[in-house]
Amino acid sequence: MLHIKTIEGQLDAKGLKFAIVATRFNDFIVDRLIGGACDYLQRHGCDRENLTIVRIPGAFEMPLVAKKLAHSGKYDGIIALGAVIRGATPHFDFVSNEASKGLAQACLESGVPLGFGLLTTDNIEQAIERAGSKAGNKGAEAAAAVLETVRVMEQL
């Protein structure tokens, strides 16, 4: 069988610096996501002093702040955490779509990996499930994704 070179990221956060952009809106959910992300990174070797949490009003503001952090050169990875919960108006669609597109654009323009932990749910119950209940903690999953991506990017 032919040998195929495979590049994989090691889940070792030692020496890396991360910024977490977290919304204040729906903070009872977002605080759980932050806890999951910080716990994951620390369990994988990241020192507390290498974590910075930036609190912002809501999801619509995330792309601008993530872009500024990514371009600062201070961080190896950015983690975006928030919760947009559907209501009775189309506001949910506008906010979640623009935040998602903007975060992707910030990541691509800067070349700095970004972990996407912006929950977009139909109701509060779904958000709770994704913030450490039945469906795991999406904050921890976003941290895992950004850590692995940082380590892959180092090898490219």
UniProtKB/Swiss-Prot annotation:
<dbReference type="Pfam" id="PF00885">
    <property type="entry name" value="DMRL_synthase"/>
</dbReference>
<dbReference type="GO" id="GO:0000906">
    <property type="term" value="F:6,7-dimethyl-8-ribityllumazine synthase activity"/>
</dbReference>
<keyword id="KW-0808">Transferase</keyword>
<feature type="binding site">
    <location>
        <begin position="83"/>
        <end position="85"/>
    </location>
    <ligand>
        <name>5-amino-6-(D-ribitylamino)uracil</name>
    </ligand>
</feature>
<dbReference type="InterPro" id="IPR002180">
    <property type="entry name" value="LS/RS"/>
</dbReference>
<feature type="active site" description="Proton donor">
    <location>
        <position position="91"/>
    </location>
</feature>
<protein>
    <recommendedName>
        <fullName>6,7-dimethyl-8-ribityllumazine synthase</fullName>
        <ecNumber>2.5.1.78</ecNumber>
    </recommendedName>
</protein>
<comment type="function">
    <text>Catalyzes the formation of 6,7-dimethyl-8-ribityllumazine by condensation of 5-amino-6-(D-ribitylamino)uracil with 3,4-dihydroxy-2-butanone 4-phosphate. This is the penultimate step in the biosynthesis of riboflavin.</text>
</comment>
<feature type="binding site">
    <location>
        <position position="116"/>
    </location>
    <ligand>
        <name>5-amino-6-(D-ribitylamino)uracil</name>
    </ligand>
</feature>
<feature type="binding site">
    <location>
        <position position="25"/>
    </location>
    <ligand>
        <name>5-amino-6-(D-ribitylamino)uracil</name>
    </ligand>
</feature>
<feature type="binding site">
    <location>
        <begin position="88"/>
        <end position="89"/>
    </location>
    <ligand>
        <name>(2S)-2-hydroxy-3-oxobutyl phosphate</name>
    </ligand>
</feature>
<keyword id="KW-0686">Riboflavin biosynthesis</keyword>
<feature type="binding site">
    <location>
        <begin position="59"/>
        <end position="61"/>
    </location>
    <ligand>
        <name>5-amino-6-(D-ribitylamino)uracil</name>
    </ligand>
</feature>
<comment type="pathway">
    <text>Cofactor biosynthesis; riboflavin biosynthesis; riboflavin from 2-hydroxy-3-oxobutyl phosphate and 5-amino-6-(D-ribitylamino)uracil: step 1/2.</text>
</comment>
<dbReference type="InterPro" id="IPR036467">
    <property type="entry name" value="LS/RS_sf"/>
</dbReference>
<feature type="binding site">
    <location>
        <position position="130"/>
    </location>
    <ligand>
        <name>(2S)-2-hydroxy-3-oxobutyl phosphate</name>
    </ligand>
</feature>
<dbReference type="GO" id="GO:0009231">
    <property type="term" value="P:riboflavin biosynthetic process"/>
</dbReference>
<dbReference type="InterPro" id="IPR034964">
    <property type="entry name" value="LS"/>
</dbReference>
<comment type="similarity">
    <text>Belongs to the DMRL synthase family.</text>
</comment>
<dbReference type="GO" id="GO:0005829">
    <property type="term" value="C:cytosol"/>
</dbReference>
<dbReference type="GO" id="GO:0009349">
    <property type="term" value="C:riboflavin synthase complex"/>
</dbReference>
